[in-house]
Amino acid sequence: MQQIPMTVRGAEQLREELDFLKNVRRPEIIKAIAEAREHGDLKENAEYHAAREQQGFCEGRIQEIEGKLGNAQIIDVSKMPNNGKVIFGATVVLVNTNTDEEVTYRIVGDDEADIKSGLISVNSPIARGLIGKELDDTVNITTPGGVVEFDIIEVNYI
């Protein structure tokens, strides 16, 4: 199976979610199933069927997280020498050459991406256009709104 790039924080978040699902959510669902069984006829017991459905979702998510963590390639850029090159995990400050608007993005794994927080997926068009570029480079990024030109003014490995 293919390795999944992940930051240290992304791996921590998945481990926290896995711990919650296994130690809190799973026991809650088991209890709900047991209570629903006590109500009798399982064929027409909506509570029972809802709890079983929740159990399926929970177990599926547990398997998904365990699979991702098992194939994770955890990258800690803070331990790498900063040579000004944009890599996975780097925080990049860009200036839109048309509007002079400054934006900051951190390139992270798919599960960590949150554009409102400035976290972009390594597979996003912006990240793909930035990876491998260097400090002071000018890059053209194809976005849904068209091609946008950015200057890379800062690259941090934090």
UniProtKB/Swiss-Prot annotation:
One of its GO terms (biological process) is DNA-templated transcription elongation. It comes from the Bacteria. Pfam families: GreA_GreB, GreA_GreB_N. Keywords: DNA-binding, Transcription, Transcription regulation. InterPro entries: GreA/GreB_C_sf, TF_GreA/GreB_CS, Tscrpt_elong_fac_GreA, Tscrpt_elong_fac_GreA/B, Tscrpt_elong_fac_GreA/B_C, Tscrpt_elong_fac_GreA/B_fam, Tscrpt_elong_fac_GreA/B_N, Tscrpt_elong_fac_GreA/B_N_sf. GO terms for molecular function: DNA binding; RNA polymerase binding. Necessary for efficient RNA polymerase transcription elongation past template-encoded arresting sites. The arresting sites in DNA have the property of trapping a certain fraction of elongating RNA polymerases that pass through, resulting in locked ternary complexes. Cleavage of the nascent transcript by cleavage factors such as GreA or GreB allows the resumption of elongation from the new 3'terminus. GreA releases sequences of 2 to 3 nucleotides. Belongs to the GreA/GreB family. NCBIfam families: greA, PRK00226.1-2, PRK00226.1-4, PRK00226.1-5. This is Transcription elongation factor GreA.
